[in-house]
Amino acid sequence: MSTAKDPGNGVYEILSLIFDFPSNEQRLWWHSTAPMFAAMLDNAGYNIHDQYRHLGIFKKHIIPFLGVYPTKDKERWLSILTRCGLPLELSLNCTDSVVRYTYEPINEVTGTEKDPFNTLAIMASVQKLAQIQAGIDLEWFSYFKDELTLDESESATLQSNELVKEQIKTQNKLALDLKESQFALKVYFYPHLKSIATGKSTHDLIFDSVFKLSQKHDSIQPAFQVLCDYVSRRNHSAESDQHIALHARLLSCDLIDPAKSRVKIYLLEKTVSLSVMEDLWTLGGQRVDASTMDGLDMLRELWSLLKVPTGHLEYPKGYLELGEIPNEQLPSMANYTLHHNNPMPEPQVYFTVFGMNDAEISNALTIFFQRHGFDDMAKKYRVFLQDSYPYHDFESLNYLHAYISFSYRRNKPYLSVYLHTFETGRWPVVADSPISFDAYRRCDLSTK
């Protein structure tokens, strides 16, 4: 009998006894992901009532939009959210103890003739969430969706002419930041398919859409102009000194009152090095205030601790097979937040640690937490991760961490981890199962 600790401290187990599921697919999604979700809420210090609320929302309003449960022998919609196409990812702001999850809404018509490129499911999902959370505003959602995703005519044209050859077809996803008993909703847009339909680059679609928005909301114009100038200089210099140009990959915004919402532009950085990350952080030397430089010192410290390999990298064009152990390194990324009435865009940089040893990453983060006074997280983080995958050989894993993001504001670091969220806790896997990462576990969930 295994003595592995149960993630969730009882909340997951109790809800599993209570919940009924309308399909086996939803039951599998719950038992695969809820153990880690429950453990993360508990370790981040959410009170017991909020843990039940957020897990209840997850079961009722999110799991129905995750599609078929992934197995190697079953066709499914592949999401850009993870390297093996899973449509869900948990993340944790370790320095602020905020739990978050991101998902690509999927429904029964996703990938069919009615919705070949998954344009529609997000609308139904947003409407469900707007019914249970006050303050959700869809003005900027509607604007960017029109600007950056396919309309019905474009979708039909791409489908009928077989113009989409790529395996990656995600256009949008949602994220919930869990704040005590409430959540803040964000949306992300990937305009790659819109680029195919219109002939405009993904980069131009994103920057043009923000430019038009800034004409109406001029309070974001100063920060946007600074970002435009920086990207233009970087891309111009790419011709002379062989640096790789920056290109916008995706965009996000908060689904709240536009007067308070933030726009984030995500730039793909194909050169992975400390000097390039320093350039991204300071906007080529434009941000040199005391707070920026304090953050830069911590960024350098993280770089030294994590030991990310350097190089010039391309983002893969396809997905890893489910259960495939990665043997790859991803390019880097940074996002820039455009705040109202702030003349300078705020950077957040990403350490792409996918494919690196998870035990070593956990140890590096623990040292960082210890050095900067996050003692509780230093004690809990590695234990939480091991307990979420109790039957794996933790020392040999290299796919639990996808990214580590870092920003610095109000004189403190904001560090988040983005984690593989699949078959967590006591997930039942047998030797001839077509799923999982070859971990053998024994737990009968057939009655739950």
UniProtKB/Swiss-Prot annotation:
L-tryptophan binds at I80, L81, E89, Y190, R249. One of its GO terms (molecular function) is tryptophan dimethylallyltransferase activity. Substrate binds at R100, K186, Y188, R262, K264, Y266, Q348, Y350, Y414, Y418. It catalyses: L-tryptophan + dimethylallyl diphosphate = 4-(3-methylbut-2-enyl)-L-tryptophan + diphosphate. The keyword Lipoprotein does not apply. It is an enzyme of class 2 (transferase). Keywords: Alkaloid metabolism, Transferase. Pfam families: Trp_DMAT. InterPro entries: Aro_prenylTrfase (IPR033964), Aro_prenylTrfase_DMATS (IPR017795), DMATS-type_fun (IPR012148), Trp_dimethylallylTrfase (IPR017796). One of its GO terms (biological process) is ergot alkaloid biosynthetic process. The keyword Manganese does not apply. Pathway: Alkaloid biosynthesis; ergot alkaloid biosynthesis. Its EC number is 2.5.1.34. Tryptophan dimethylallyltransferase; part of the gene cluster that mediates the biosynthesis of fungal ergot alkaloid. DmaW catalyzes the first step of ergot alkaloid biosynthesis by condensing dimethylallyl diphosphate (DMAP) and tryptophan to form 4-dimethylallyl-L-tryptophan. The second step is catalyzed by the methyltransferase easF that methylates 4-dimethylallyl-L-tryptophan in the presence of S-adenosyl-L-methionine, resulting in the formation of 4-dimethylallyl-L-abrine. Belongs to the tryptophan dimethylallyltransferase family. Homodimer. This is Tryptophan dimethylallyltransferase 1. It comes from Claviceps purpurea (strain 20.1) (Ergot fungus).
